[in-house]
């Protein structure tokens, strides 16, 4: 079968790989000049099954009220004259009830555990190098109320098979000695030994090269303009060349893996997709003295930040700014990343200035992505992974390839139709 994948981020590229391995003839189109050049470019770097608690949960409303008026708030909502933003926000509130949160955690943990296993197998098979570390993820807490709330979520995750262990401050420092300068700030943590970290951009570029060798055709510099339909089928995709005119591409099946831009393409053909961009920030520091920086990946739950060691670099990433498709760097939010890093690692030494970046995460109200078939028989989705695109990429892609090939996917997951 000829399959056209729209998007060459980590989700689109893994989709192309698994589809090619399933025997399909695959073409990937992307507006960028290389794979992994947008949302996958400088994210937090965590393979974090332990990050499965959805943003929508019973604790979020008090937190949002506490953060009102703060430009550096972990979650910043900028009201816009945008019906999609309002509709998304209302659905988000509906996902905050305990029963829905438990259901969403179950789905995310199931897919994330499966995906981590597929990533490990792929890394071993292909010998992929992407600054990966298998030292687990330590969630740290500097607020006792936040720590108490996190214990409830950790208990639920353990019920679904995740090894998330509660630890005291001494154990936090034993796991990651680089936190010794922040001992007076910490109140506790929890640790998932089986989690990992690595550079999503390096992984995506490396896998794209293997996919090319396996026969996948990557066509860069093509902007997807619209999808053409006839009845219950997709009959083509119109693209615009960065240097040239339009072109119509056809295939037997089509996969939309365009992240936050997916709903803009799907809305005109009647596929409503509650995905909204959540802008995340990152700062990448080149280390002057490696021994002073963490090697265990960290999640600062109070500030919604993650810290991942990537070779001789330290990546700090996180927060969520709901501001439409705006990609401007907010200097206050950028500085908040640096300030928190200095608080936690006061002895850290770096070379030069931090490299600052922001990207748009495709967030669903439930944090559960959309993977599966639409009402058009040959149109498939793999999008809406929010902060967990890197974590769930391999599992989502392998599952999608199974479904397109007419087989039942392995994970227990609510594969959705729109």
Curated annotation (Swiss-Prot):
Ranges that cross the membrane: none
Gene3D superfamilies per UniProt: D-Amino Acid Oxidase, subunit A, domain 2, FAD/NAD(P)-binding domain
Cofactor: FAD
GO biological process: D-alanine catabolic process
Binding annotation for FAD: 3-17
Keyword vocabulary terms for this entry: FAD, Flavoprotein, Oxidoreductase
EC number of this enzyme: 1.4.99.-
InterPro entries to which the protein is assigned, alphabetical: DadA, FAD-dep_OxRdtase, FAD/NAD-bd_sf
Catalytic activity, as annotated: a D-alpha-amino acid + A + H2O = a 2-oxocarboxylate + AH2 + NH4(+)
Pathway the protein contributes to: Amino-acid degradation; D-alanine degradation; NH(3) and pyruvate from D-alanine: step 1/1
GO cellular component: cytoplasm; plasma membrane
GO molecular function: D-amino-acid dehydrogenase activity
NCBIfam families xref list: PRK00711.1 (NF001933)
PANTHER family in alphabetical order: D-AMINO ACID DEHYDROGENASE, SARCOSINE DEHYDROGENASE-RELATED
Similarity comment: family membership: Belongs to the DadA oxidoreductase family.
Biological role: Oxidative deamination of D-amino acids.
Protein name (record): D-amino acid dehydrogenase
Taxonomy of the source species: Bacteria, Pseudomonadati, Pseudomonadota, Betaproteobacteria, Rhodocyclales
